[in-house]
Amino acid sequence: MKRKIIVGSRRSKLALTQSNWVINKLKENYPEFDFEIKEIVTKGDRILDVTLSKVGGKGLFVSEVEQALSDEVIDFAVHSMKDVPSSLKEGLIIGAIPKRESPLDCFVFNRVNSLDELPQGSVIGTSSLRRAAQLLKHRPDFVIKPIRGNIDTRLQKLHAENFDAIILAKAGLARMGWLENTTLKLEDIPPELCLPAVGQGALAIECRESDQQIRDMLTSIHHEETGICVEAERVFLKKLNGGCEIPIAGFATRANEVVHFKGLVGNADGSIILASEQAGANPSEIGNKVAEDLLSEGADTIIKELRNI
């Protein structure tokens, strides 16, 4: 039996923080094992001067990590779930999904303290088409400007490049300890205004389907409710063949064994937003049903047009 486990991670501060969090959780259950992180640079890490939607393709932040997993260079990998394509590389599975952090997006303001205080024509930093489309539907006067880099870099750019606000995932801020920073002017964005990305706030721990030892180990940190909700979201994403070049969002919650799921697809400027909600016990059925609702409303036309731009 293996005593040293090699964990694959991107080398960003957030990715390493997440990987160390997973390792510490596993050490509580398996103190006899040693864990070592292997840092892997992905295509998404290398290309910083182009927005993700223009880079195109899927798995920009996971493909190289998945290859290392397939080649048995690493034993499992820790990803942000929202970066993981809806179809995994052959022979790989999601071995565990720990309890979800906040799925919300949040504003970080430069001068004001709330969305309502932002003046007409405010410049908002985000490279996410999903965030941009939903925000423009609410405030078409906003000017959306792309912003790339890790959390620290984007927070520096907020002031250095004179944005009125930038949008970040609250989970990343929480994991990096920024929510305790009282100098930041933060405001949560409710799902009614900006529905989160599929899997946002959740981690995906990926392993080889054939590696039963690792699979057994990972089940100890799997969170069933998060897994059920993320299943609905990812089935929805797969049905629509979504990627970062499409403004697509999906968020599920669960109460009393009933999954409530809302999904949406829009065009880039937010002038068209198609949305549907469903509830039921079976997460796959609910995710599929919402996707079918949107396809019947013309989502496939929007998706094809965006992919041809």
From Swiss-Prot:
BP-aspect Gene Ontology terms: protoporphyrinogen IX biosynthetic process
E.C. no: 2.5.1.61
Transmembrane segments: none
Pathway given in the UniProt record: Porphyrin-containing compound metabolism; protoporphyrin-IX biosynthesis; coproporphyrinogen-III from 5-aminolevulinate: step 2/4
Cofactor(s) the protein requires to work: dipyrromethane
InterPro entries tied to this protein: HemC, Porphobilin_deaminase_cofac_BS, Porphobilin_deaminase_N, Porphobilinogen_deaminase_C, Porphobilinogen_deaminase_C_sf
One cellular-component annotation, GO: cytoplasm
Quaternary structure note: Monomer.
Similarity comment text for this entry: Belongs to the HMBS family.
Protein name: Porphobilinogen deaminase
Organism: Listeria monocytogenes serotype 4b (strain CLIP80459)
